[in-house]
Amino acid sequence: GLLATSAAASRAQGLESLRVAIEDRIRASGAEAVGVYVRDLVRPDSLLVGAALRFHAASMMKVPVMIQVFRDADERRLRLGERIPVVNTFRSIVDGSPYGLSLADDSDSSLYARVGGRASVRELVDLMITVSSNLATNILIERVDAARVQRTALALGADSIQVRRGVEDGQAYRAGLNNTTTARDLGVLFAAIAEGRAASARSCREMVRILQRQRFNEGIPAGLPAGVRAAHKTGWITVTHHDGGIVSARDGRRYVLVVLTRGIPEEAASARLMADIARLVHGAVAAR
């Protein structure tokens, strides 16, 4: 009745002042574009600021790839313990011409020493997410197929994400065939993982654990209080810096936060923006 109505009204007011604070911080950043998606996983509250703006997905596309791998494991199309060849020759989606990845452009170099050998699917997923290995990503995409990753993302409600290809396909890049996403698309995928809908409940718990082992923590986690865990993924390419995932407060409250940015040349500045937005969001969500 009345109490519930007034609680809802004060929540709406809290969300509105959060929106204003986030918009002010974005303006101050001088960014060309910023997309923010917040979804409370306890209450039916969400906040969207530029959440429909389209960005180059960068390494955020590794999240739907992980989801597809776990769904395939659930359906016994592959085994996580299965050891598959570590290769560094891939085919361009434009004309099938071969290309390889350069160690210098990859945030993880460990896998290159193992080309010609084998690695387990589980290990490749771990490298793809925690250290954002491009090589692991392309090996897994060849295994699960980008078109299937795309269909799964759409089925989960990420209705405008485009997962077209692996990483560093120069021909595709020149042809404008890029992986793109909105903050909302990614937020919907993280919510599906958090709520155990992206794959089996067991697989979703495992995906959260992998995301919690993320090594790049200069963005969202830097804005969170000690003891608050983020299960998240980052993405960085030239002047495009992203971070997003599932935040678990100490009292068990959980929410999804995604921040996508374009046009901030300085990585330290975009990291500060993400951390500040995380601080604002956490203050508002945890206070309610």
Question: Model segments located where?
Answer:
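C-terminal segment of classical bacterial N-terminal signal peptides
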Residues: 2-9
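Structured C-terminal helix/loop/strand segments within mature extracytoplasmic catalytic/sensor domains
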Residues: 14-25, 143-145, 188-218, 229, ...
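Conserved catalytic neighborhood of penicillin-recognizing serine enzymes
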Residues: 91-138
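Mid-domain, small-residue-enriched loop/turn segments at the edges of structured enzyme/sensor domains
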Residues: 33, 117-121, 125, 131-195
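Active-site SXXK
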Residues: 44, 56-89, 95, 128, ...
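Beta-lactamase-like hydrolase cores
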Residues: 11-53, 280-284
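Solvent-exposed, acidic/flexible segments
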Residues: 15-19, 31, 54-63, 77, ...
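Extracytoplasmic
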Residues: 29-34, 42-44, 50-52, 56-60, ...
